[in-house]
């Protein structure tokens, strides 16, 4: 069948527009993509723990007015730049959180000083988290609610999303920690980063306790420009970005879709054809429902949604 040159040019133009974002290894899924990230996004070097903390406090996470904020509970200090950053922060109640706990694989180098999973936190909140897995804790189960420089032991009457939460059940192994809402996606992507890059050092079983929760948090709280800037700033020291920050589609493509999946293959017959387009179009016009995995399979421009631009790209793939 012949197609007009004008039609093909239009498709190519739309295809180029769709990939304006940073998409890592388009068309790959599952273990193949996981291994690629692991092999290509290692830090070329780290600063060592003391230097990493100093840089993080005084440069990476420092806000206007020399404000340094603990990510879990929102507690802020004014950092005195004439002093040693780590000492001055510590004296004011801020220390360094290893999002992946030191006792479970981050206790030696380069994991210990890799800034992609390090954050400033209020000291007592950091201690409360300990090496707990992350979770959405039912409000009735929360034992302590942390905000700014205080905690309460009853459900807050207002600003509930600004509190970090800790559950202390009788069995210590069941303890869980929940960051405040605005930190959840950042925490999830720090965890994805560590588990991918340092898979062989990560304690067995710890990841599985929270993988589904972290996937939810990632999609609930996608990277904003501040998080992207943070990743870029860290890359200027370590030589690597957090790939899950610069390409949010990776989480779904690696952890929800199996390797070997063909982009747009909605009916699982290992080919992309008109039948697959019918399924996708039916969803777009509201005639059918799809689970999120299926949406990601046909998300041809990797914007975490299924719309008409994806159809245009998939049609172009069929015509080629």
Give residue ranges: language-model regions.
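N-terminal module-boundary/linker segments of secreted carbohydrate-active enzymes
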Residues: 21-77, 254
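Bacterial N-terminal signal peptides that target proteins for export
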Residues: 1-9
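Sec/Tat-exported extracytoplasmic proteins
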Residues: 41, 45, 60, 75, ...
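Domain-level detector of nuclease and nuclease-like folds
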Residues: 87-95, 99-259
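Cellulosome-associated attachment modules in secreted, modular CAZymes
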Residues: 259-320
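Bacterial N-terminal signal peptides
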Residues: 9-18
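Low-complexity, Pro/Thr/Ser/Gly/Ala-rich linker/spacer regions in secreted
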Residues: 19-24, 252-265, 320
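Short, His- and charge-rich active-site/binding loops that engage polyanionic ligands
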Residues: 75-93
């Amino acid at each position: 069948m012949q197609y007009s040159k004008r039609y093909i040019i239009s498709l190519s133009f739309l295809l180029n527009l769709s990939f304006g974002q940073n998409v890592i290894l388009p068309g790959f899924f599952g273990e193949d993509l996981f291994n690629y990230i692991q092999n290509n996004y290692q830090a070329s070097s780290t600063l060592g723990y003391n230097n990493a903390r100093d840089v993080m406090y005084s440069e990476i996470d420092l806000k206007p007015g020399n404000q340094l904020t603990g990510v879990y509970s929102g507690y802020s200090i004014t950092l005195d730049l004439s002093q040693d950053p780590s000492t001055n922060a510590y004296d004011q109640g801020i220390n360094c959180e290893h999002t992946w706990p030191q006792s479970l694989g981050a206790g030696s180098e380069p994991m210990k000083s890799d800034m992609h999973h390090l954050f400033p936190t209020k000291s007592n909140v950091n201690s409360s988290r300990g090496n707990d897995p992350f979770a959405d804790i039912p409000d009735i189960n929360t034992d302590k609610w942390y905000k700014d420089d205080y905690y309460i032991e009853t459900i807050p009457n207002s600003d509930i999303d600004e509190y970090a939460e800790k559950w202390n059940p009788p069995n210590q192994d069941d303890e869980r920690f929940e960051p405040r809402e605005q930190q959840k996606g950042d925490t999830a992507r720090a965890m994805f980063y560590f588990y991918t890059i340092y898979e062989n050092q990560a304690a067995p079983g710890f990841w599985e306790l929270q993988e589904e929760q972290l996937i939810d948090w990632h999609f609930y709280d996608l990277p904003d420009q501040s998080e992207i800037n943070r990743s870029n700033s860290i890359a200027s020291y370590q030589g690597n970005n957090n790939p899950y920050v610069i390409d949010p589609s990776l989480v779904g493509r690696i952890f929800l879709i199996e390797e070997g999946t063909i982009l747009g293959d909605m009916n699982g017959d290992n080919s992309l054809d008109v039948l697959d387009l019918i399924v996708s179009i039916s969803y777009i016009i509201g005639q059918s429902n799809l689970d999120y995995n299926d949406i990601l399979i046909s998300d041809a421009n990797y914007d975490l949604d299924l719309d008409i631009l994806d159809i245009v790209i998939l049609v172009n793939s069929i015509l080629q």
